Amino acid sequence: MSLSAADIEFEEIAFTPRQEAVLECALGLLVEGGEKALTTAGLARTANCSKESLYKWFGDRDGLLAAVVAYQASKVHFPPESGATADAGTFRKHLTAFATELLAVLFGETSVALNRLSIGQSNRDDNRLGRLLLVRGKHMISAKARALMEAGRHRGYLKFDDAEEAYQVLYGLAVRDVHIRLLLGEKASEEERDLNGQAEVAVDRFYKLFGA
């Protein structure tokens, strides 16, 4: 897999275990030292791989940054539609699992650090990280979540007029103001760290609004 700066739309990218290990190292460099710390030489040294392998896998530095963000977003998993919508109970479990993984990614140290870094660069015209976090992160996840909800509506498990509106409601119920408080340096409470419990409450409330 080779990723260029232009390849930042919604196509699926499958990383090998070795590539995932390298991208974890890249995330670590970004969190610790910011975007300037993510160099091919530094990553090759930290991940114990050659610069040639990095170029082969990810292309140039923009491609590497795109791959890092795509890898982080890929930690939110989506099941095949046929499996997710087998019955009403299964669909609800998958929706809860999605909300749990979304919270795990958003509330995790890595995501918080990446968002802080992007916010710090928001007044720059070349804020590549911010654009990638939107396109390869937020927009990709929301597009897949809308598709999951549409599948649930098609099977009669949910009722809504607009999938984007329904998703934003679920997002708000699950995330609330916790993410912004984490970005501002506040620690999550013990209750807020119970991600599955928070997701279940959010989905319960969501079904009161949109359950068929």
PLM features: residue spans?
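Short alpha-helical elements of helix-turn-helix
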Residues: 20, 24, 116
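Amphipathic alpha-helical packing segments from all-alpha helical-bundle domains
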Residues: 104, 108-113, 117, 127-154, ...
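Helical hydrophobic small-molecule/effector-binding pocket
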Residues: 70, 92-125, 174-178, 208
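Helix-turn-helix
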Residues: 21, 29-63, 67, 71
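Short helix-capping/turn signature of helix-turn-helix
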Residues: 35, 58, 119-125, 136-137
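Amphipathic alpha-helical interaction segments
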Residues: 63, 97, 113-117, 165-169, ...
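C-terminal peripheral helix-coil segments that are non-catalytic and often amphipathic
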Residues: 1-9, 97, 101, 143, ...
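Amphipathic alpha-helical linker/stalk segments
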Residues: 10, 69-98, 106, 145-148
